[in-house]
Amino acid sequence: MLRFGTVMVAAMLLATGAARGHEAEPPPKKETPAVPIKFSETRRGRVLADSRGMTLYYFDRDDTGNKSTCDGKCTEKWIPLVAADDAKALGDYTVIVRSDKSRMWAYRYRPLYTSHDDTAPGDTNGLDPENLWHIARPAN
């Protein structure tokens, strides 16, 4: 009878796969968002914002041909929205390579920046008196 019970337990283990030695599959990897840009409501209306909620801006002197002209001292006030090495374009969001070989995000081929003057999510203090910097807004 003991032998019959042992055979039955072994058969049940085989039937359920428990005796195969398989471990549970690891949980799926958490994927980081493909594009670290979201929409945010501010006192100036709906804007594009980075993952922290900081308003994004674009520069009139950047042409829309995948080039940033804000280098050197300019980046002390206007911080490029950095793209990871493995970042991929998605829809209206593209990745451009800067003159220093770093990568940054662009929206509709316009490079995106945050402003040093914005200190909290939703701030829109980055507009300049020369009207060269503009708040980036989602397309309608």
Short names for language-model regions:
Residues 5-16:
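Bacterial N-terminal signal peptides
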